[in-house]
Amino acid sequence: MEWSQIFHDITTKHDFKAMHDFLEKEYSTAIVYPDRENIYQAFDLTPFENIKVVILGQDPYHGPNQAHGLAFSVQPNAKFPPSLRNMYKELADDIGCVRQTPHLQDWAREGVLLLNTVLTVRQGEANSHRDIGWETFTDEIIKAVSDYKEHVVFILWGKPAQQKIKLIDTSKHCIIKSVHPSPLSAYRGFFGSKPYSKANAYLESVGKSPINWCESEA
């Protein structure tokens, strides 16, 4: 199974013309993130056959030079967003990795699908592209991963992500959940939750190679 087939199946099942038309207008008349060519970067960097872990985000960062198509990740020269800083703090506490760069492309290439449930946003307006159709698309992506893959780790931080559990066959996949790494909630159960070592322990238990969460130039 490949993304091209899954995309075909989804667009055959659902009509996204209204969303397409909306996005054409938005990109023509407003500043929208990420750039058009990066909307689907999560799928470009993580082929379907390579998926070992799915980390769900919400919508892209809405500031300049941040979003580039991967949930929680920002472009190499951007400042660290607070949630990502907390993710790295937990990573250091969990498995001793100290990451210096704010982008997660190496995770994506390792097999971590960094999926936002909404893939675009207008500059400076969080959630501005909610309910235009992206949730239908990404719900189908989650279901496809659940249906066609086995032994995938789904990391679900915060209530919106955890609402997607209903789309996942928990009998053949691993669910790791906690509060969101946002500064508003990180001290209420994200710190100390050890998602990275737990994910690798599960992958190794089912005969898969672990994720290299540490800094990589690959």
Swiss-Prot record:
Record EC number: 3.2.2.27
Enzyme class: hydrolase
Keyword annotations: Cytoplasm, DNA damage, DNA repair, Hydrolase
Active-site feature positions: D59
Pfam families named in the record: UDG
Catalyzed reactions: Hydrolyzes single-stranded DNA or mismatched double-stranded DNA and polynucleotides, releasing free uracil
A GO CC annotation given for this chain: cytoplasm
CDD domains with a match to the protein in the record: UDG-F1-like
Chain coiled-coil ranges: none
UniProt GO MF annotations: uracil DNA N-glycosylase activity
Gene Ontology biological process terms in this record: base-excision repair, AP site formation via deaminated base removal
InterPro entries, per the entry: UDG_fam1 (IPR002043), Ura-DNA_Glyclase_AS (IPR018085), Uracil-DNA_glycosylase-like (IPR005122), Uracil-DNA_glycosylase-like_sf (IPR036895)
Protein family: Belongs to the uracil-DNA glycosylase (UDG) superfamily. UNG family.
Biological role: Excises uracil residues from the DNA which can arise as a result of misincorporation of dUMP residues by DNA polymerase or due to deamination of cytosine.
PANTHER family listed in its UniProt record: URACIL-DNA GLYCOSYLASE (PTHR11264:SF0)
Protein's UniProt name: Uracil-DNA glycosylase
Organism expressing this protein natively: Staphylococcus aureus (strain NCTC 8325 / PS 47)
Organism ancestry: Bacteria, Bacillati, Bacillota, Bacilli, Bacillales
Gene label: ung
